[in-house]
Amino acid sequence: MKRFLFFIMSFISVITFAQQPVELPLWPDGAPNSNGLTGGEKEVSPHRISNVTDPTITVYRAPQPNGMAVIMCPGGGYSRLAMDHEGHDMASWFCGQGIT
C-alpha cells in the first residue's frame, strides 16, 4: 500500500502545474487478487462503459487551486460505470470551484 501511495503522489507532484486531466493506471503491475477477467472496455450505452479490467485514476487539476481535493468513484462496479455525469462532469464542476 505504501508503494502504491508513493507512486500516486509522485505522479501528482509531477503534474502539479498541468491543467489537462492526467490519466494514471490504478495498478501499473496488475490488480492484486485479480479475478482473471480480460478484454477491452465496451460502451454499453451512451456515456456508460463496462468490462473495465485496467482501471485508471484521472487527475483534474484546478486552474486556481484552493488547497482542497476530492476523490470521485463513478458508480457501477464491473457492470457499468457512469463516467460522464458521475465522473468527468463533476470533476469539471469541482475544478471550477478550485478543488482538484
Residue positions per predicted region:
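Beta-hairpin (beta-strand-turn-beta-strand) motif
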Residues: 62, 75-76, 99
